[in-house]
């Protein structure tokens, strides 16, 4: 059964993509989640498919933007837990890298990238509102690989535990529909 427009929430794919097409909202979201200023952004792919090859599984990106430094950000809304998010993020990263590195180009040409999933559930199961991952040396637990990739899983279910007021308000809005910050009121 299809929902009417008035019944859509930010968690609905259509509405999430429409809201994130507002450059100010999308930029502020990224800065809030990553705790960094990211500069001007440009949209690369509003809900476009990316295929790694003719017979490869394609992916459909909800929101795909790049900042003025060349970093790319894939933002996805995930409503149901299919228990495959880490591997799905891995595949998305690989498909994006393949799609944006042309034959003959050096690997150095790969831009830094972030894969961000906003989830209505706790995909990792540790009760945190935000999980940020990058490749780290197992032997010393601190040396980064510096491959330019980060993966972020946002758990709207844990909105009460978010320390940043704006992030807490956004997560509560995603989970419950309650508007209580300037950001979510836009």
Question: Model-found features: residue ranges?
Answer:
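Elongated, amphipathic alpha-helical interaction scaffolds
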Residues: 1-186
């Amino acid at each position: 059964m299809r929902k009417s427009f008035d019944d859509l929430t930010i968690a609905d794919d259509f509405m999430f993509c429409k809201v994130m097409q507002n450059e100010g909202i999308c930029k502020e979201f990224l800065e809030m989640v990553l705790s960094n200023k990211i500069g001007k952004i440009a949209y690369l792919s509003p809900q476009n498919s990316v295929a790694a090859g003719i017979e490869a599984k394609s992916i459909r990106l909800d929101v795909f933007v790049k900042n003025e430094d060349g970093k790319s950000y894939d933002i996805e809304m995930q409503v149901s837990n299919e228990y495959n998010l880490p591997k799905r993020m891995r595949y998305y990263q690989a498909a994006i890298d393949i799609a944006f590195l042309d034959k003959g180009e050096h690997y150095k040409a790969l831009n830094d990238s972030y894969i961000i999933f906003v989830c209505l559930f706790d995909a990792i199961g540790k009760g945190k509102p935000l999980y940020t991952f990058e490749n780290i040396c197992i032997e010393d637990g601190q040396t980064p690989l510096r491959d330019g990739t980060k993966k972020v899983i946002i758990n709207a279910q844990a909105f009460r535990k978010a320390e940043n007021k704006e992030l807490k308000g956004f997560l509560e809005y995603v989970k419950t529909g309650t508007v209580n910050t300037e950001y979510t009121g836009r």
